[in-house]
UniProtKB/Swiss-Prot annotation:
It comes from the Bacteria. This is Endonuclease V. The record marks 79 as: Interaction with target DNA. GO terms for biological process: DNA repair. CDD domains: Endonuclease_V. HAMAP family: Endonuclease_5. Its cofactor is Mg(2+). Keywords: Cytoplasm, DNA damage, DNA repair, Endonuclease, Hydrolase, Magnesium, Metal-binding, Nuclease. DNA repair enzyme involved in the repair of deaminated bases. Selectively cleaves double-stranded DNA at the second phosphodiester bond 3' to a deoxyinosine leaving behind the intact lesion on the nicked DNA.
Amino acid sequence: MDWGREFFKWRGYEETVKLQEELSKKIILEDKFKELRYIGGVDTSSLGEKIVGIITILVFKTLELVEISVALSEVNFPYIPGFLSFREGPVILRAWEKLKIKPDLLIFDGQGIAHPRRLGIASHIGYVLDVPSIGCAKNILVGFYKEPDKRKGSFEYIYHKGEIVGAAVRTKDNVKPVFVSLGHKISLNTSIDIILKTSTKYRIPEPVRLAHLYSKRMLNSEIEGEPF
């Protein structure tokens, strides 16, 4: 299937920036879902010419893992800050197509609107799939924030060019915060709440943590010639 692929084609720097700016105007910044039954975690791993995309599906209330979708592809786009979705988007779409259970919301290892043009990977892919999405990054990309209190649940907003674009959220006592920004069809405060509810034992939310673990395992198995 080739649906959605046109949203990830490189068109030269100026045209690609223009595409990001156009799509960012279509991002919905409020909650557009009713019940969360299933929640997905999205991550990729790459080495050399190969990239693996993983989507984990968990029951939201219990965080029970019920499905893992894997896609393997050749890397056809260099790593360029601010254009991560063009590199990772196609393999994530392949993983999405294979899912038997489509989640009510996706959490990405990356940015939502906390992006120079307000279209990080969570916003870009959330829009293309028309699915509520959250960006949860390990590092800040744009803006500034005040360090939140050391206790789990504390957060401080991230500001960029006079706008609130995300929040630094403490998901574990005395551990570096994660950087949360809404992706699409969800508010920032709801995004923060969901990240805290899905971050149980670790700094990283469980859906994304599992996606990261499986993407590394899959990539290593492929390189070593072993079955996943």
